Design a protein with these regions (language model features):
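Acidic, surface-exposed loops and disordered segments
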Residues: 1-194
Length: 194
């Protein structure tokens, strides 16, 4: 099945995402369902331009990391980073609202994008470890609720983590490109009332 081979990708190759593949993913987003056809969000594309790379670097080094299991915590210690935000293409779902209806629509839309991307051979990595208003203000939006990295994995890891270095100094780690979450939720497929 499509998702059986899927990995959460956090480490990316330099291979560019082909325009026709990005167009296909965007078309699938355009066609995804929305409650009462409201579509109270927009999808922004962060590519490899200088301005976009600056935002992605800020996301990685300053905004989405976790220290002691707290996003953006200050202090000493090794941090867990979120390499999904360094993908060659990062899609961002932005909205003026911060309510459940909009977030549910964004979840449907972003999952549609993930499935479309995986279907055509792209690797993907969701990231929701962010503060929606802070990120929104950084890019001129009210809120950003979800990020999805698209590209090609540099490799599939056999180890669960990789060390992260900046200027030769170990800063922390990130999960490797491997299957995460497989068979963790054992509550799927229960029939009601049986």
């Amino acid at each position: 099945s499509l998702l059986k081979l899927r990995n959460t990708t956090k480490w990316w190759s330099k291979k560019e995402v082909e325009q026709h593949k990005l167009d296909y993913v965007l078309d699938c987003i355009y066609r995804s369902p929305s409650k009462q056809l409201k579509y109270n969000f927009k999808v922004l594309i962060f590519d490899e331009t200088k301005k976009c790379k600056q935002i992605k670097d800020w996301l990685y080094w300053e905004h989405t990391y976790c220290l002691n299991k707290i996003r953006g915590a200050k202090g000493n210690g090794l941090r867990r980073y979120n390499g999904q935000v360094l993908a060659p293409i990062v899609l961002a779902w932005a909205s003026e609202k911060n309510d459940l209806e909009v977030i549910e629509d964004i979840m449907v839309s972003s999952t549609t994008a993930l499935l479309a991307a995986e279907d055509i051979g792209l690797n993907t990595g969701f990231n929701g470890c962010l503060e929606s208003r802070e990120l929104g203000q950084k890019i001129g939006e009210t809120h950003v609720h979800m990020l999805l990295g698209l590209g090609y994995a540099d490799k599939i890891d056999t180890e669960p983590t990789r060390k992260v270095f900046k200027d030769g100094v170990e800063m922390g780690y990130d999960l490797g490109n491997g299957v995460q979450g497989e068979r963790i939720n054992n509550s799927i497929g229960e029939y009601y009332g049986r």
